[in-house]
Amino acid sequence: PYAGPVVFLLLGGFLLALGIERWDLHRRIALTVVSLVGVRADRLLLGFMIATAFLSMWISNSATAMLMVPIGIAVIVSVGAVDEHDRKSTERDEEDDLLVGVRGEPVERPATGFGLALMLGIAYSASIGGVATLIGSPPNAVFAGVAESRLDVQISFLDWLVFAGPLSIVFLFVAWLLLVKLLRPEIPIEQGAEDVIRTQREELGGISRGERRMLAVFTLVAAGWLLRPFVLQPLFPAITDTVVAIVGGVLLFVVPVDYEAREFLLDWSDATRLPWGVLLLLGAGFSLANAFRESGLDTVIAESFAGVAGAPLVVLVLVIAIVVVFLTEVTSNTATATVFMPIMISLGITLGESPLMLMATAALAASMAFMLPVATPPNAVVFGSGYVTIPQMSRIGLWLNLLGIIATIVLTYLWLPIAFATAG
C-alpha cells in the first residue's frame, strides 16, 4: 500500500508543487489573476478566491493559503480595512503584518467587512479548489486508491476532474456570493489595493528562465493528465496518471536553468521539503482499509446500519455527508476519509447500493469543513493572521457547511453516474 500508484501520483504532484514554489510561479499566477479583476471590493475578493482555488488544484491547500495570506494582509493594511478603534493598538509596519500572517501568531485585530471577507475567502477557496483534482486534496487520492484496490475501478485524473470540477467552480462562486451578501465588503481606499498589487508584480520583475521552463513542464504534465485517455493511452496503454506524474517529477531534476552553473528546476535540497508525512499517512490509510477488509470489521460496521436498509439512497447520502462534514471539523480530513472509505464499500454492498457513490460522498464531504480553525490548515493559517475570530469563522462557515452538504448530495446523486460512466 505504501508504494501504490496513488501514493506515487501524489509524490509526483508534490514535486511539481515544489518546483512551482521554488520559482515563485504560483505568486506570479496569483498576482496576475488578482490584477485582472479590478480593485472594486467584490471583484478583488473574487480575484483572490479564483487565484487561490486555481493554485490549490495543483499545490497543497496549506501552501496556497500561506502564499495568499501575506498578499491579502498587505492589501488590507494598504486600504485601511481595519476597524478605526483598532488602529492605535495595532499600528505596525507592513513587514510586521506580513510576518503575522506567515507565522500564524493570533493577534487581537478584528477587521471590517472587506478584511474579514478576504481572509475567509482565501481559506475557503483553498479548500474548495483542492476538491477539483486528485492531487488537490488527500481525501480525493484516498478515494481513488481504495476504489482501485477494493473495487478494481481506476479513477483517472480526468475522471475526477470531470466529476468534481463542476462542483469546485460552482461552489467557489457560491462562497463568494455568500461572503459578499453577509459581510458586504467595501474598500475605503481602492487606489491602495491597486498600488500594493502593482508593487508586488513589479518586485517579481520579468519572467525568468526558470519560471518559463517550470511553466513548460507544468503545462506538459497537466496536458498529459487531461489528454492521456484520448492521446497517450491508445498508443501506450501502460501509461497511467502515475507515470505522467513521475515523469514530470524526474524532468524537474534534469531540465537545466543554467547548465554551466549546474542549476536545475529542482534539486535534492528542495526535495527534502516533500511532505513525507502525508505520503506515509496515505499508505497507512490504504493499509488500514485492507485491515478492515481482512478482519471483517468493515462488514460488522456496515451491518450495524441495517436499520437504514429501507431508506432511499438520497437519505443515506445525506446522512453520510452530514456525519463526515461535521466530523471533519474536529479531525483530519485525510484520517476521516481513510476510516470511512472501507466502511462505505461494505455499507454499499450490504444495502445493495453503489459503493462508489457512498465513497465519493465521504471524500467530497471531508473537504467541506469551514467552521473551525482546526478543521483545515487554510482555516488555521487565516485564523493565525489575527483578522478572523472563531465566532466569525463559525458563523459564515456554518452556512458553507450546510451548502456544501447540499452540493455534495446533488453532485454524487445526479452527476456521479454520468461522470464515472467510463471509469474502470
Language-model regions, residue ranges each:
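Membrane-interface segments at loop-to-transmembrane junctions
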Residues: V34-V39, E105-A111, V196-S208, D267-W276, ...
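Membrane-embedded alpha-helical segments and adjacent helix-loop junctions characteristic
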Residues: P1-K88, D93, G101-R109, G277-L351
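C-terminal transmembrane helix pair
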Residues: D96-G101, A123, G165, L280-L288, ...
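Hydrophobic transmembrane alpha-helices of multi-pass small-molecule transporters
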Residues: P1-L11, A17-L18, S149-I155, D159-E303, ...
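Re-entrant/interfacial helical elements at transmembrane boundaries that shape
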Residues: S62-V77, M119-A123, A132-S149, G192, ...
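Residues that define the loop-to-transmembrane-helix transition and helix capping
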Residues: D42-R43, L116, L158, T242, ...
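Membrane-core helix-loop-helix motifs of multi-pass transport proteins
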Residues: D86, D93-P185, V381-T412
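A cytosolic-side transmembrane-helix exit/cap motif
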Residues: P1-G4, R28, D83-D96, E260-W268, ...
